Amino acid sequence: YDDRWDRMTTWDFFKRRLVRLHPMVIMGTLLGASLFYFSACSAFPMVMQTPWWNVLLMTLLGCLMFPTPTSWDIRGWWETNALNGPTWSLMWEYIANVLYALFIRRFSKLALGIFVGLSACLTLDVTLNIDTFGLLSSRGEAAYTLIGGWSLTPGQLYIGISRLLYPFFMGLLLSRIGKLVKVKRGFYWCSLLVTVILVMPRIGGETSQWMNGVYEAVSVLALFPLIVAMGSNVTGKRSVALCKFLGELSYPLYITHFPLIYMQIAWARNNPDAPAGMHLFIAVSVFVLSIAIAYACLKLYDEPVREWLKQHWLMKKNTKTSK
């Protein structure tokens, strides 16, 4: 949005972001509510104890993107939205959008570079378990990782902020610099690199947990920005078409897939003696169904709703002005 501020007010920006993001927030929450009781298992001990009216209340709060405290949890994972966990990171994106519109868009490259360095220190503080502010002592198995950020507790809020700031400032700085790494078939190489990075299991044993912290820090601070720089210059016709499709699908997939994951976890807990082949079948089915639901939501709901909001809300001011 850096190149649009000469023809867009701050309120226009907020409306554009709401139109882009919020319809699927509502859809993801409604999907999570409809499948909530199908996720009952020992991993989610509170599900069957939750009355229907409480689910309806959480649905309303989720649709409004109102983060709930841990005392209001109805699942057992203390998420800000117990019906659709991934919205915790979207909450941070909303905050980043507000800060960008009010202040950060005016930052120079030097200022962005300084904030990149400062936010990198926060990333290192979490991944290496340095715990400068004394907020990470209760992380347990999540120590030396970036796992966390989805609860309204001091430690989780700190992890959430740490996970937000470096990618946000680094992404904005890369966009401002505009110098991309030109690699032939860069999209495919970048896809391979992302896959390799993400499939790596946790490294280091109980006495060498720091090794995993170093791996995650290097991945976030160096490898992911490099991949973005390498993959942002796609020119091939097929590559552009594939990128366009995946880009359109990514947000609906992100915001709708987790209710199915809850159900998969419940099935695995409730069927501990199921053969490996059945687990594989369930996993593949969840993968395929997640993509199908995301694509259906995109074409049948998200795009039509956004177009309607664009015509009746975003462009309403311009129409009145022209009249």
Protein language model annotation of sequence segments:
Residues S34, G117-D131, L192-G205, Q264:
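Aromatic-anchored segments of alpha-helical transmembrane domains
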Residues D12-F13, L21, S89, L112-G113:
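Alpha-helical transmembrane segments and their helix-entry boundary regions
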Residues T319-K323:
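Intrinsic disorder in cytosolic terminal tails and internal cytosolic loops
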Residues R17, L21-V25, L249-T256:
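Loop-to-transmembrane-helix entry motif
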Residues G28, G32, Y100, S290-L298, ...:
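Alpha-helical transmembrane segments of multipass membrane proteins
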Residues L21-Y94, T123-P154, V218-G231:
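Membrane-interface helix-loop-helix regions
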Residues Y1-D12, T68-W78, L102-K109, L146-Y295, ...:
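Alpha-helical transmembrane segments in multi-pass integral membrane proteins
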